[in-house]
């Protein structure tokens, strides 16, 4: 999702969308909008975003970026966004998120950093939601 500011647009994570919508006040006489917002919140609460915190998101960004820097590569904005939104739980998922992963960075290490920063509960999948 994009947030558009006066002179700048910014891409935000599912966690940030969830936080924004939860803190948004209900608008009277906007029944369809309120229903839509509630449906989005219900969906996002079934994703890893529901188990993330501001601190865990910052820590994940920091640790994965540091790992990439030590590997001599750069994690792209879209890749970081997918890491935070999906919270990969396997090396295969890391490879799907990071382009040319095998040539750029160790997927095992990325997975370890994701689990350490976001927490096991944010990474483990609920089979009912797949």
From Swiss-Prot:
The terms describing its cellular component in GO are:
DNA polymerase III complex; RNA polymerase III complex
Where does the protein end up? Answer: Nucleus
**N-terminal signal peptide:** none
InterPro entries attached to this UniProt entry: HRDC-like_sf, RNA_pol_Rpb4/RPC9_core, Rpb4/RPC9, Rpb4/RPC9_sf, RPC9
Q: What Gene3D superfamilies does the record tag this protein with? A: 1.20.1250.40
Q: Does the keyword Disulfide bond apply?
A: no
- GO terms for MF: DNA-directed RNA polymerase activity; nucleotide binding
Biological process terms from the Gene Ontology for this record are: transcription by RNA polymerase III; transcription initiation at RNA polymerase III promoter
Give yes or no: UniProt keyword Nucleus: yes
Please give the Pfam families that the UniProt record associates with this protein: RNA_pol_Rpb4 (PF03874)
Q: Check the record and name the SUPFAM superfamilies matching this protein.
A: HRDC-like
Keywords tagged on the record: DNA-directed RNA polymerase, Nucleus, Transcription
Which domain of life does the protein's organism represent? Eukaryota
Please give the function described in this protein's UniProt entry. DNA-dependent RNA polymerase catalyzes the transcription of DNA into RNA using the four ribonucleoside triphosphates as substrates. Specific component of RNA polymerase III which synthesizes small RNAs, such as 5S rRNA and tRNAs.
According to the record's subunit comment, the protein's assembly and interactions are: Component of the RNA polymerase III (Pol III) complex.
Q: Which family does it belong to?
A: Belongs to the eukaryotic RPC9 RNA polymerase subunit family.
Q: What is the protein named?
A: DNA-directed RNA polymerase III subunit rpc9
Give the encoding gene's name. Answer: rpc9
């Amino acid at each position: 999702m994009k947030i558009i500011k006066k002179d700048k647009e910014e891409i935000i994570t599912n966690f940030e969308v969830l936080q924004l919508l939860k803190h948004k006040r209900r608008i009277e006489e906007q029944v369809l909008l309120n229903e839509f917002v509630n449906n989005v919140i219900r969906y996002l609460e079934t994703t890893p975003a529901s188990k993330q915190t501001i601190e865990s998101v910052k820590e994940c960004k920091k640790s994965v970026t540091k790992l990439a820097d030590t590997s001599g590569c750069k994690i792209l904005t879209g890749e970081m966004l997918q890491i935070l939104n999906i919270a990969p739980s396997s090396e295969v998922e890391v490879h799907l998120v990071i382009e040319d992963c095998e040539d750029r960075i160790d997927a095992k290490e990325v997975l370890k950093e994701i689990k350490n920063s976001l927490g096991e509960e944010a990474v483990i999948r609920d089979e009912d939601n797949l």
